[in-house]
């Protein structure tokens, strides 16, 4: 029997000053115990934000509850990268195992609810938010040499892909500038760590680079791409800016 792998999205609030470790029982003590011990901190005292403390758990959501009807909880799920809508009411997460972009309603952060998912044409590596859209990078590479990927523009309200922007390589991370005018995508073109010829060490081509998207106006069809060459900058492996 396949061993199920569970993932959970943890919703936390923050109060300044010291962080206190959570010692109270949680609904998923057991398979989530390690995650909670490592990542969930809870400030001492009440949960109304009046007492000093740090991060504290106010809710969590098991990603298996956001599977499609009829799908088995034995399916492996991953909640890896999370971004929030600009109104703070929706969380968008990447699930690389299922190749999905999931949505969770945190209007009541103590009682999060799944809102479904968008099935993607590749493995999601990162997600960020610009206005009404989630910007999700996906890896569509055939192998470590023949690399490819796309930036998917997803309408958050309708959960639909409204534009696909080819990136020319395997993307890693995505970030939107604070003024909302640019999106930067790191094209990693990661190395094969099991490559016998190199022992998994760099340099391994193709080289990585940076893609900048000019977020012109509110219509994603007007957005444009620029590529920035990053070779020759680093002292170590300058030909391979992975």
Residue ranges: model-predicted function:
Residues 86-88, 129-131, 176-180:
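Residue-level detector of Asp-centered blade-edge/turn motifs that repeat once per structural unit
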Residues 148-159, 200-218:
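Beta-propeller blade signature
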Residues 59-102:
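Beta-strand-rich domains and repeat architectures in extracellular enzymes and scaffolds
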Residues 108-141, 167-171:
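Blade-loop segments of beta-propeller domains
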């Amino acid at each position: 029997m396949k061993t199920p792998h569970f993932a959970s999205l943890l919703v936390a609030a923050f109060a300044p000053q010291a962080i206190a470790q959570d010692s109270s029982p949680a609904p998923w003590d057991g398979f989530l115990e390690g995650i909670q011990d490592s990542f969930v901190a809870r400030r001492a005292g009440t949960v109304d934000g009046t007492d000093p403390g740090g991060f504290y758990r106010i809710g969590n959501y098991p990603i298996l509850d956001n599977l499609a009807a009829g799908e088995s909880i034995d399916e492996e799920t991953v909640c890896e990268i999370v971004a929030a809508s600009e109104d703070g009411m929706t969380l968008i997460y990447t699930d690389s195992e299922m190749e999905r972009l999931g949505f969770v309603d945190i209007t009541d952060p103590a009682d999060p609810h799944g809102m479904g998912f968008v099935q993607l044409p590749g493995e999601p590596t990162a997600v960020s938010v610009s206005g009404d859209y989630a910007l999700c990078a996906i890896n569509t590479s055939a192998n470590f040499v023949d690399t490819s990927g796309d930036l998917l523009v997803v309408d958050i309200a309708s959960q639909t892909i409204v534009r696909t922007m080819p990136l020319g390589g395997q993307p890693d991370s995505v970030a939107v500038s604070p003024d909302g005018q640019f999106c930067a995508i790191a094209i990693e073109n990661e190395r094969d760590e099991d490559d016998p010829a190199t022992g998994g060490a760099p340099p391994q081509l193709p080289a990585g680079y940076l893609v900048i998207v000019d977020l012109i106006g509110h219509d994603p069809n007007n957005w444009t791409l620029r590529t920035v060459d990053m070779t020759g900058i680093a002292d170590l492996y300058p030909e391979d800016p992975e």
